[in-house]
Swiss-Prot record:
Pfam families linked: CIDE-N
Stretches assigned to the CIDE-N domain: 26-103
Protein's name in the database: Lipid transferase CIDEC
Ranges for region Disordered: 1-33, 203-222
Quaternary structure, from the entry: Homodimer. Homooligomer; undergoes liquid-liquid phase separation (LLPS) via its N-terminus, facilitating lipid droplet fusion, occurs at the lipid droplet contact sites. Interacts with CIDEA. Interacts with PLIN1. Interacts with NFAT5; this interaction is direct and retains NFAT5 in the cytoplasm. Interacts with CEBPB. Interacts with isoform CLSTN3beta of CLSTN3; inhibiting the lipid transferase activity of CIDEC.
Organism, as annotated: Bos taurus
Amino acid sequence: MAMYTAVSTSVVTQQQLSEPSAEAPRARPCRVTTADRSVRKGIMVHSLEDLHVKVRDTLMLAYKPFFLVLEEDGTTVETEEYFQSLADDTVFMVLHKGQKWQPPSEQSTRYQLALSHKPAKIDVARVTFDLYKVNPQDFIGCLNVKATLYGTYSVSYDLHCSGAKRIMKEALRWALFSMRTTGHMLLGTSCYLQQLLDATEREQPPKSKAASLIPTSLKMLQ
């Protein structure tokens, strides 16, 4: 009986060790913005709870209560299942108590009404640059450029920098090559100018000979 118990215990232990452990959710890139869309940050999160923590740290919200909605349509993000079903680089909007999601068009209309009271200041174009990292190991990261014309038409473009270290290395190499080429050109130009000045000085007559010609010409006139 004792031998049977020992064997069954070893089998159970082996089965428990052979079971694969649940994989942790991978880090996903996303971005967060404020209700007025004036601030936009890029972060990496594993879950919805992790997103709340990093939003609080990134936007320095301390203990202020907030909730998250999708920036494109205002859908509330409340469950982990719905969060995991979203695509990468999704933009979340942070709303506080009393704030409501508004589409960009309504915000542009309010912006134009506010400008109507101040006709002396009209923004023709506004360009914002948002530099963020999708991977913490990236050297430069990603650049989001957003241009707004007359507060109505907006265009945004995401530039994902791949191989940033290689790009920087090539840029430094070309900068070094340009500086060397410029140095050689300046050195060659200075040598040419020096030779030109020396040749000009050789063609001019000496001052002593020019002075001696004056008394000779006077004697001939006498």
